[in-house]
Design a protein with these regions (language model features):
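Mature-chain termini and adjacent capping regions
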Residues: 1-144
């Protein structure tokens, strides 16, 4: 019976909803109230009022405001995919900081929009100013 319950818990998608954001995880979701963080593994999905992100693993820091959890820093690991408006960002690693609304992706990065596909090894996406900086492996090339 115990093995059956563990199997069910491991296969269920865990979901925690907040006023503007949520985290889902296919394997595990660990809440650390002392350090105000979440660790998620397996088919991770994170959504806030700006974008939705998918990855194999996530570590998220939050702060409490009016009894609500507001995610301030979100790190995504492996097979990262971020959907923002009509664009899709992909990379090996991403970090989002709420203070400046910047997403930074590293490693095998791409930006896909309806009219183009750009690739590189680092992307800095300034959400508030609608600006993208894509760096390639060659230090001499830059796309803005």
């Amino acid at each position: 019976m115990t093995k059956f319950l563990i199997l069910i818990l491991c296969t269920l998608t865990l979901k925690f909803s907040y006023s503007e954001s949520y985290v889902k995880a296919g394997d595990s979701l660990v809440w650390d109230s002392e350090n105000k963080s979440y660790n998620a593994n397996g088919d991770v999905e994170f959504k806030n009022d700006k974008f939705i992100a998918f990855a194999d693993e996530m570590i998220a820091q939050y702060m409490e405001n009016n009894n609500k959890e507001i995610f301030t820093i979100v790190e995504l690991f492996e097979n990262v995919k971020i959907e923002f408006k009509d664009e899709i960002f992909r990379g090996d690693y991403a970090i989002y900081t709420r203070d400046n609304n910047i997403i930074k992706l590293i490693g095998d990065v791409s930006i896909q929009s309806p009219s183009r596909l750009l690739t590189g090894n680092e992307l800095i996406a300034d959400i508030d100013n609608n600006k993208r900086i894509l760096n390639s492996a060659n230090d001499g090339s830059l796309v803005e």
